[in-house]
Amino acid sequence: MGATSMLTLLLTHPFEFRVLIQYKLWHEPKRDITQVSEHPTSGWDRPTMRRCWEFLDQTSRSFSGVIKEVEGDLARVICLFYLVLRGLDTIEDDMTLPDEKKQPILRQFHKLAVKPGWTFDECGPKEKDRQLLVEWTVVSEELNRLDACYRDIIIDIAEKMQTGMADYAHKAATTNSIYIGTVDEYNLYCHYVAGLVGEGLTRFWAASGKEAEWLGDQLELTNAMGLMLQKTNIIRDFREDAEERRFFWPREIWGRDAYGKAVGRANGFREMHELYERGNEKQALWVQSGMVVDVLGHATDSLDYLRLLTKQSIFCFCAIPQTMAMATLSLCFMNYDMFHNHIKIRRAEAASLIMRSTNPRDVAYIFRDYARKMHARALPEDPSFLRLSVACGKIEQWCERHYPSFVRLQQVSGGGIVFDPSDARTKVVEAAQARDNELAREKRLAELRDKTGKLERKLRWSQAPSS
């Protein structure tokens, strides 16, 4: 941010200005891949690897910063892994390539990626990562330098992903269907494009010895991590994707008749463009709420996965995108502006999340706080209200089970201490105390009745006439 932007931020959002200053002053990168001491693991001294790092910056500047802080040679491995998947995704997304051209490339990409000298310059000029494929020789050269254990994982994940992408691309081209039908199809698509990324990364952690070997077998948890990120991006990027006629929201959700009936209509939406048409705002928000509920279903599995990580750099690499996803979900929820503009969390909020996402407890509480914000904005007339409440409650329950919070206390005049009445749990504690007091009172009464009975019996015995 320039000086003018910072001055404007100081005047309009002073708290955010303070957060950014704190981030600038105190958050130091864990490593600098350009330093000579890092060259053996980062490969910065080689022109080919340096170009790969440049491509990473161009494709995802925010993500590249997180990758570069991963310790050892894992940063270089993840960089190449990301570029391979980005190259694959670029071909799959290119609407200018006919299906007969796209299919053989997609289905052979895992072999082409490591083939010396292979490049591809037939992507449309508007594809932002086109140059990556044009200069693919730098990627293939570095891939072939990797240890076999890492390279085999990259090739295996690419082969699985390309199969799913090719199948979906062929279906769209041959059936003229532009929509994903069911939630199951939606989950499968997200598994191919994101869940497999989580699987590959986790296998890297295990293969490197930096995490437990059995972690690589936790496929359900790794899939949840990927699906949570992908589904959040799909919600946020709705309008951008719609303008390019890419529709990832499943018809099973956006076409539900319940959402139409909730606003007095007979049916749900029939076409996705109806979501951003004037007069459909309320029904569109109900659809969006259903999409958010679907994402929140992956939250506790993601928290379970993060609890298994032991290396700080790996934990931060995995945790920061997840907390960003929760922040993005909260920003999108009940925000109709999302259907017309590309929205994103503010820079200061992102900086705060980066600084706070350092351990499982704090990350869990970040999840909980954003879940509370969404639940506070939920409306009872929303057909998904109950399911949303349950999803948010499960996050609360997970946090209390693994990282119990403390009931807040408040000092009153005279030096006394009482439970803070603004803490919702105060009522639970007060009810428990009242129950304990009532049980104690009943016990005392029972003891008094017993003593009284004994005295009465003793008195009657003493007054009885002797025989």
From Swiss-Prot:
Reaction(s) the record says it catalyses: 2 (2E,6E)-farnesyl diphosphate + NADPH + H(+) = squalene + 2 diphosphate + NADP(+); 2 (2E,6E)-farnesyl diphosphate + NADH + H(+) = squalene + 2 diphosphate + NAD(+)
Highest taxon of the lineage: Eukaryota
InterPro entries in alphabetical order: Isoprenoid_synthase_dom_sf, Squ/phyt_synthse, Squal_synth-like, Squalene/phytoene_synthase_CS, Trans_IPPS_euk-type, Trans_IPPS_HH
Reported induction: Expression is induced in ganoderic acid (GA) producing conditions.
GO biological process: ergosterol biosynthetic process; farnesyl diphosphate metabolic process
Family affiliation: Belongs to the phytoene/squalene synthase family.
Known role: Squalene synthase; part of the third module of ergosterol biosynthesis pathway that includes the late steps of the pathway. The third module or late pathway involves the ergosterol synthesis itself through consecutive reactions that mainly occur in the endoplasmic reticulum (ER) membrane. Firstly, the squalene synthase SQS catalyzes the condensation of 2 farnesyl pyrophosphate moieties to form squalene, which is the precursor of all steroids.
Protein name as catalogued: Squalene synthase
Species whose genome carries this gene: Ganoderma lucidum (Ling zhi medicinal fungus)
Higher taxonomy: Eukaryota, Fungi, Dikarya, Basidiomycota, Agaricomycotina
